[in-house]
């Protein structure tokens, strides 16, 4: 779960990370009151879970409370990369002398943790990593040890901090590691981490991603979820325990097993190049259970996406045999009735495949087309989606 900046700021503060004052506001009037309470120069910052706020006009400096009112009036309701701004954070202005970068994240490729640090912050870190990779220090973190004082010292030295700053920055890094470890995060990022004119090290912006698999250890994490900010289809799928991610294409995807679903996305995208450049509309893994209830729930979510023009069901029968999957599809279509109004291409293989195909053939549903292979199914689904565009 990604946190809003103001939530990350509050979490940092709770773990002793130095931050400046910040108050969330949902209306221009609340923004003005917050600016008056903080006093002096403030920054009005759009609260959306996406980057590029500054370039989109979602971050503005306010020298007075009236300016904070004006800026928040313009920012609230703004669309930033498809995300509507429903709240802003009024942040205390900072006297910035230098900007740095720090993050610690789960390194899935190497089954490890990774700390990244640079004395050049404030810019897109991806751009820095490409243009000047030597400016971004990367230090592997042993999960069994974490970031202790020795490792924090190693990180700041590798990043090239001046000797007189290393102790201060290392102290902040230790506290950020405390956030990462104790909150079960998969990402903690500060960009920029700044040195103020007074020489203090302060986290001026923050990004935190929490591991939802660890929610059972953190009752308070449920309170951080903003259902209004979630994609409605993803929220609907989550309520039904479906592993669903919405994408931007036209071909709905249902499969069993994350690996098979990801392969299906690739094959559909490739097939779409020959059919109007249609693309996958979602990732949906129904796992090992393909009952009528699960299939109906999955189809209900996918068919609720107005962008979807066809659906490709790609299942390899294992523990759940293909005949059970076929019965689930037939039952799902019957349960959904008129709301099932888009063509389905179904490819079955594996355990009891012949019986599964027989069940679908006998059902003879007008929306269902059987495919013998994944390539054939992807091509047909892309063709149908393109025809319906």
Swiss-Prot record:
Binds 1 Mg(2+) ion per subunit. Pathway: Carbohydrate metabolism; tricarboxylic acid cycle; succinate from succinyl-CoA (ligase route): step 1/1. InterPro entries: ATP-grasp, ATP-grasp_succ-CoA_synth-type, ATP_grasp_subdomain_1, Succ-CoA_synthase_bsu_CS, SUCC_ACL_C, Succ_CoA_ligase-like_bsu, Succinyl-CoA_synth-like. One of its GO terms (molecular function) is magnesium ion binding. GO terms for biological process: succinyl-CoA metabolic process; tricarboxylic acid cycle. Mg(2+) binds at residues 191, 205. Keywords: ATP-binding, Ligase, Magnesium, Metal-binding, Nucleotide-binding, Tricarboxylic acid cycle. PANTHER family: SUCCINATE--COA LIGASE [GDP-FORMING] SUBUNIT BETA, MITOCHONDRIAL, SUCCINYL-COA SYNTHETASE BETA CHAIN. This is Succinate--CoA ligase [ADP-forming] subunit beta. It comes from Arthrobacter sp. (strain FB24).
